[in-house]
Design a protein with these regions (language model features):
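Active-site neighborhoods and metal-handling regions in enzymes and metal-associated proteins
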Residues: 1-388
């Protein structure tokens, strides 16, 4: 169970950020911010609901992944959680509550979404969320929707994690490792991609939609497809290589772990490559320093991958020639990592300031997702790769 004090400190930090955001945007000091978790949606032409995922700015305040929930922030007032619990015999509408987080919020229970109107001063409220048409139909067109300077400010601040957030991410990583161990064991036993995937879910005790992203479970040649989306069910007793990219979510915060395993019977050059890549990853982690730019880590990664390719006689060219010709990018077309938090690819990886100034990925590696200067309390991944 998370610490009640850590969560209270987290909420206090959010209150400070949101009050500063209102001042930054130059709106009235009496303004409120209404954050919507989102609404349930359905597949086109069908009555089957798409698995719901709450808006991350809502989850920042409330660890409840349910549709049509609202957090109302007003400076000087305790944050109000407008908890909509419909009367419904078709679905379980229970919202699990625990005092470690409920004690920091003023919870107002409502039966219908329409009931939120009595708590909203529309003329002085800024709405954050996806359902602009729905919320303006309910509260009026004068409601400010997704004010760009406000989103820029809040997105930028999301890169800096509180102690509570870091604690959730630590747990998410520890839980994912249990699943990765089970997946590795299943691979050694000759299970199929589908079987390995199920072993991961079972070990983590989660359903597919509860994971922070869709698991990638790739055997042999399919491991060369970066976002391989299938789960083959055929016999895999002779498979030599497993790549698994899978995480775990805790109170909205997700881990992101990619591992590659090779059997003893795999090609010796590949096994050597794998061992060296694991060493390379550790070296990259050791190189992280506050004040450096994340793009420097990526450039160092490309240099190290290139040197390794030359060392193993996979590429025959000098380091300088390889980098100029962008040969390492043929083997590592992705970025070395990204910010991590309420979204696996967390927001504001390119954002350089509160105003929303963007620094795009360098032309030599357009897939890089983070160009921020490294600062304390940031959480990001370091995940070099070498794909064939």
């Amino acid at each position: 169970m998370p610490s009640k004090q850590l969560f209270a400190d987290h909420i206090a930090s959010l209150e400070n950020n949101y009050q500063s955001a209102l001042q930054f945007c130059g709106v009235s000091e009496e303004s409120s911010i209404l954050i919507h978790s989102g609404s349930e949606h359905f597949y086109y032409g069908d009555d089957r609901a798409i698995a719901f995922q709450a808006h991350a700015h809502f989850l920042h305040w409330v660890p409840v992944n349910k549709p049509d929930q609202f957090l109302l922030f007003t400076p000087g007032q305790r944050p109000r959680y407008l908890q909509v619990v419909p009367s419904d015999y078709w679905h379980d509408q229970t919202i699990d509550s625990a005092d470690w987080w409920t004690d920091s919020l003023n919870i107002i229970r409502l039966d219908r979404v329409e009931d939120i109107a009595k708590y909203i001063d529309t003329a002085n409220t800024l709405y954050l969320g996806q359902e602009a048409e729905m919320i303006q139909g309910l509260l009026g067109n004068q409601l400010s929707v997704n004010l760009s300077p406000l989103l820029s400010y809040l997105d930028y601040k999301r890169a800096y994690k509180t102690e509570y957030e870091i604690a959730q991410l630590r747990i998410a990583n520890a839980k994912a490792l249990i699943g990765h161990k089970a997946a590795a064991d299943a691979f050694e036993q000759g299970l199929s991609e589908y079987g390995i995937h199920q072993a991961y879910l079972q070990a983590c005790e989660i359903l597919e939609y509860e994971a922070p992203y869709t698991n990638i479970v790739a055997l042999d040649e399919k491991s060369a497809i970066l976002h391989y989306q299938n789960k083959r069910r055929g016999s895999a007793i002779d498979s030599q290589v497993l790549l698994i990219d899978a995480g775990y979510r805790v109170n909205g915060y997700g881990s992101d772990i990619t591992r590659t395993y090779a059997k003893d019977s795999a090609h010796p050059v590949f096994r050597t490559l794998l061992e060296n890549m694991e060493t390379l990853e550790t070296e990259l982690v050791d190189s992280v320093e506050v004040g450096n730019n994340y793009t420097d880590i990526h450039a160092l990664t490309l240099s190290k991958v290139g040197a390794l390719l030359r060392k193993l006689d996979i590429v025959n060219a000098d380091d300088g020639v390889m980098l100029e010709a962008r040969l390492p990018q043929l083997f590592m077309p992705h970025g070395v990592g990204h910010l991590l938090g309420l979204q696996v690819h967390d927001v504001a990886g390119f954002q350089q300031d509160l105003a929303g100034t963007m620094k795009p990925a360098p032309a030599y590696s357009a897939a890089l997702r983070n160009t921020r200067t490294i600062e304390e309390n940031m959480v990001f991944t370091i995940e070099p790769g070498c794909y064939f």
